[in-house]
Amino acid sequence: MNHEHPDIESQQSAADAAAAAGVNDEVERLRAELDQVKADVLRERADLENQRKRVARDIEQARKFANEKLLGELLPVFDSLDAGLKAAGDDAHPLREGLELTYRQLLKVAGDNGLVLLDPTGQPFNPEHHQAISQVPTPGAAPGSVVTVFQKGYLLNERLLRPALVVVAAD
């Protein structure tokens, strides 16, 4: 140290202190910036994970309902086969047996693809699955129960594809 020039020493100490304070300020600024970058990285990771989950959910929904249009277009075929079987009565005619077999096979294939038949005769009316077309007084039937089904309804993977058209017992 230079004892002969105390002013120079104090100036040098002041300069060192100022430099140290500047370095400390820079370190604090860099730490704050690092904390911000870490927070940004965590947020981006969370966003990426959420996006991945959303895409997986969308793909699952697309796969689950990919055959909705085809099965929806088959509903009139089911209706025609069902009506033909009802019109044929209980005769054990080979044509009737063939129609029954075809109908059961079609229902099985559709069922294997998520289609569920709604035939609510005798069940309580459910506005989420049934469409009431009329109410009739029906002795012996519980009020609000389905007494006649004009057109069966269908669910596709637990989602309503077509409501059942029904007549409900009046109160």
Curated annotation (Swiss-Prot):
Residues 1-22 are annotated as: Disordered. Participates actively in the response to hyperosmotic and heat shock by preventing the aggregation of stress-denatured proteins, in association with DnaK and GrpE. It is the nucleotide exchange factor for DnaK and may function as a thermosensor. Unfolded proteins bind initially to DnaJ; upon interaction with the DnaJ-bound protein, DnaK hydrolyzes its bound ATP, resulting in the formation of a stable complex. GrpE releases ADP from DnaK; ATP binding to DnaK triggers the release of the substrate protein, thus completing the reaction cycle. Its main location: cytoplasm. One of its GO terms (biological process) is protein folding. The keyword Chaperone applies. InterPro entries: GrpE (IPR000740), GrpE_coiled_coil (IPR013805), GrpE_head (IPR009012). GO terms for cellular component: cytosol. The gene is grpE. The keyword Cytoplasm applies. It is found in: Cytoplasm. The lineage of its organism: Bacteria, Pseudomonadati, Pseudomonadota, Gammaproteobacteria, Lysobacterales. Belongs to the GrpE family. Gene3D superfamilies: 3.90.20.20, Head domain of nucleotide exchange factor GrpE (2.30.22.10). One of its GO terms (molecular function) is protein-folding chaperone binding. Homodimer. Keywords: Chaperone, Cytoplasm, Stress response. It comes from the Bacteria. PROSITE patterns: GRPE. This is Protein GrpE.
